[in-house]
Amino acid sequence: MADVIKPQTNSTDKGEVPAVKVSVDVDPLETSEWIESLEYVIRSKGTDRAHFLLETLERLAAEKGVELPFQSNTPYINTIPTERQPAYPGNRELERRIKSIIRWNAMAMVVRANKYFEGLGGHISTFASSATLYEVGFQHFFRGRGESGYDGDHIYFQGHASPGMYARAFLEGRLTEENLKNFRREMQPESGLSSYPHPWLMPSFWEYPTVSMGLGPIMSIYQARFNRYLENRGIKETANQRVWAFLGDGECDEPETLGAISMASREKLDNLIFVINCNLQRLDGPVRGNGKVIQELEAIFKGAGWNVIKVVWGEEWEPLLAADKTGLLSKRMMEVVDGQYQKYTGMPGSYIREHFFGKYPELLELVKGYSDERLEKMRRGGHDPEKVYAAYAQAMQQNGKPTVILAKTIKGYGLGESGEGRNIAHNKKKANEQELLEFRSRFGIPISDEDVGKMPFYKPPENSAEMKYLLAQREKLGGSLPSRPTTVTKMEVPSFEDYRKIVERDYGKDLSTTMGVVRILSRLCKDKKIGKNVVPIVPDESRTFGMEGMFREVGIYAHAGQLYEPIDSDQLAYYKEAKNGQILEEGITEAGSMASFNAAGTAYSAHGVNMIPFFIYYSMFGFQRIGDLVWAAADMRAKGFMLGGTAGRTTLNGEGLQHQDGHSLLNAMAFPTVRAYDPAFNYETAVLIFDGLKKMYGEGETAIYYIMVGNENYAMAEMPEGSEEGIVKGMYRFRSRDVKNAKGRVQLFGSGAILNGVLKLSLIHI
């Protein structure tokens, strides 16, 4: 009982953030006057005026030499106070029932699969913790593709939450019961469901592969930027399309997750929303057991220039926060580390009373009227639809910054003592009959005790209030998600014959294949048929490849245009940035460049517009460095050209082995949709490029053409008559000679870097 619990008088490091030194208030009366003044300004003139005054004071303090401690964190409470919450527009009761049914079907799908097929795998706990985050989005925010089929939001669903998306699609009538029974069994007669979002396996359903972890965040950032690129170049209106990325707090340890967030703020991508499910757990245990991951991420994203919205506590905590005039509750919330919060999840209310509130007598007094059961049921913010709705609504208000929502949840929410908040939650994929009964009862699923063990899927009658509401909400928002069109818009493309004369000009000259391919790329950017669709992508190597002449011709894309006079403005090939620029100059990031390639290479399915990416880079820094993103490109059916520059035995020998690429062709063989070539002559690169244009864009094939290009000058030979087909297939007869009285006949094979040696060898008399 509350009246027999004694407050903890000794501060302990156990379960708490280490204490920090704070300033002593030497004049409490003066402090209260300042606080009252600020409260008056907020009340009478609004938060904008208060913000201005505080900024002015901060600036004055700096001018007078007052050193203020850097503060990147706000208190461990919700960013949006109750009084600023918008009214919730939906039917809370119907939405709760729909969400509960989806929870059951998602859980039953995984448990059933592992009951009948031992070791099949799957994940329950991620969606269990994030169901509210998704359902508020599906019911009120996520825009479908609409009548055009290409005007919806782009959503990167967290890979481990895929069972929840399947369960919702089942209710919508897009998936059958047999589909759900075949979870992770794609080869069954009636199509099964892939483990994670895989467009290659489910081309009409998934759009974006988000596994392995870290891929979704970086690709979503560059997708949001590419949407702006399309709009600024006048190719497609994308202003109303949002990019949502759902990810986990543990996923933020992946370099790709946080590595490009500064680009998002630099490009003012207020069309981008990250939702981080902070359930405080990863596979092995706590994400930050001895710290506070929400505070850590808040500091990181704030420092990178993002809007940060914290959704930490549910509405049950509001009366306590309002009643606490001492500030001790907010202080206690900040003191407790994540590992201890995880402990509270699995403990009774009496433990929470003693170990959380019991630290201070005032807090025990605050909850003396609360039963232990009531304390147990006080939710985290990510499980409160009204708090989540308020966060999403604010994120939709564009202010020139991307937004991250840090939503605190419980991993395995609803799974009971065997899975809720436990370290084993991530790998949980089985449940006994008692656990199923408890889950059924907790979420009110109309399945009898006798049938629970069979794990049947449940779908309300078509004329039920739940089904009518579910379908009406999605119709209002433009249709179901995720969804991917399978029809491919084809386009008229130029042929090799259109460019043959340009190629023939090189015959007999000493040139590199890099120079040849850049010439073709420059011409293609001006081509009447496809010029505006070409997307040159370079990770800060344009001058290495001799592309600087394209700066003035087509411009470098910059969302704000060029706000300065470039130092080389008096030169012909000056560094020209423009809002409608065509080149994506990505800086030193092959990963970011590949993410742009993926966005451009899937524009045909995402936007209904064929864009043609040409990603040129140092060949050594391609497949072996960003192979996972290339695999994602293949999975999401991207198309385009990857050009591996300075390939083979480069003339840059002084650069060392890091620039001696003899194996990227071997790496390329690991990617099923990649067609890899090692040309030696410019006519070969030209034939391959125009073959790629014809097959990928003229005929609609899904492929990526990888073409190695070198920087060693070759004497450009004439193209042998009738060799086009052989070039595309990978082998053709370049030259032959008969030698009188020869003792035998030798066939020599060669390409790219070795071909000069092969040609010299062919002159030896046997």
Give the positions of each predicted feature.
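A glycine-rich helix N-cap at a beta->alpha junction
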Residues: 174-185, 268-275, 303-304, 633-648
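Long, well-ordered, tryptophan-enriched scaffold segments
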Residues: 278-505, 726-734
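A short alpha/beta connector and helix-capping loop motif
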Residues: 254-279, 630, 637
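Conserved small/polar residues in nucleotide/adenosyl-binding loops
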Residues: 764-766
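Cofactor-binding active-site loop characterized by glycine-rich and histidine/acidic residues
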Residues: 85, 89-102, 106-116, 123-267, ...
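Non-catalytic terminal/interface segments that mediate subunit docking, oligomerization
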Residues: 85-106, 127, 142-146, 153, ...
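N-terminal amphipathic, basic-rich helices that act as targeting or association modules
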Residues: 2-171, 439, 514-518, 522, ...
